Structures are given as structure tokens and as C-alpha cells.
């Protein structure tokens, strides 16, 4: 798999228009591109101008195909003056779960007229010391297995690694609601992971985007299943 982790800051007063344009790109991508499995759009709960995408593709070629689509061009043209500052983009490989997990967001028969956007999602970059990357990955994979297999409220606990900078990892966590995330923070597996990796970060962790799913709605497929690797 290839994943694009993208973070934006949007100019004041333009977030709603940006999100409407982004939803058009998301629908076009997941609905029409065979190599695009997810195009998740997240809005931070505390700062609505902070918005993130998690885009999942079959491979690098599928990303290149996406970039040439009319819906992508329409989104880019519509939003180019709405973005405040540089866009953070990281092209990644999946570390956890593996390719056999459930990646496809599509679900037949979803009626978006009855949609809800009540999930709680974390979109976080983790800078890791170069000599601790492998150890960090092993530790966070154990947390991922515990989260997705032992917590009914954890739908995804994905770990990604930037393909051009192996020290840059990403977490993409999806919970059924904020209460499920609070439960996650009390579990033994996250306590063990936090203690294990506490000294393995390379400087300060950038502020994560934590908030709701703007698109797709809750009724789509968000779960990775119960992956063990």
C-alpha cells in the first residue's frame, strides 16, 4: 500500500468551502479510481482550520493516476487560495496493519442522506531517533494489535512510515467516539508502549490533528478488522 498523510491549515472563514471541495475530490477518488481505497477527511475539534487527509492507494502508480484526474484538478483549483501556509505531505508505506487487512472504505448501499460524522480520529506525525526506528516500530505494532483486537471501540490503529525519511512515522487511529479513545488511554498496552518509547522521539512531536470525520460518514467501512500483523 501507499498512503498520503496530508495536513492543512485553512484561512479563517474558508474551512467550510474547503471541506465541500475536498468531499468532491474524495467521492471522485474512492468512487472512480480502482487504485484508491480511502480518502478520509478529518477536521480538528479544537481548531476547525486544521484539516487532514488520509489517502490510501494500491501503489505509487495509483497515486500518479489520482493526480491526473479531473476531480483532483477541480479541487486543487478551487482551494489553492484557501490554504494558509505550507501543506504537510508525507508519502508512506504501511507498517501496521499489513496488506491483507481491511483497507477499502467503500460500502454498498450507504445513504449519505442519513449520514453522521461522530468518529474520533487521530492523525499524528512521530519523529523518531534514527537508531531507534526499528525498536519503535516493534513497540507500536504491539500497541496496534492490542488496540484493534482488545478494544471494541478502536476501528483502526494504523502505523505508516515515510518512504523518503524512515525516521518519520505516522499514527492514524480511528475510534467510534471520544469515549472510546479515552478508554484506549487507560489500557495496559498503551501504557507499556508509552513507557517503552518515551525517550525515542527526535525532538518535540508536532501537534496532532484530533477530531471528527468530515467524509466519509460513519456508515462507510472504517474498520481494519482484527489484524495481527
Show which residues each predicted segment covers:
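Extended intrinsically disordered, low-complexity coil regions enriched in Ser, Thr, Gly, Ala
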Residues: 16-20, 32, 134-140, 149-152
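Surface-exposed interaction/gating patches
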Residues: 111-149
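An amphipathic, aromatic/His-enriched active-site/gating alpha helix that lines ligand/cofactor pockets
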Residues: 24-38, 56-91, 146-155, 174-210
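Short structured motifs
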Residues: 37-38, 107-109, 141, 155-156
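N-terminal/domain-start segments enriched in small and hydrophobic, helix-friendly residues
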Residues: 7, 11-13, 20-26, 45, ...
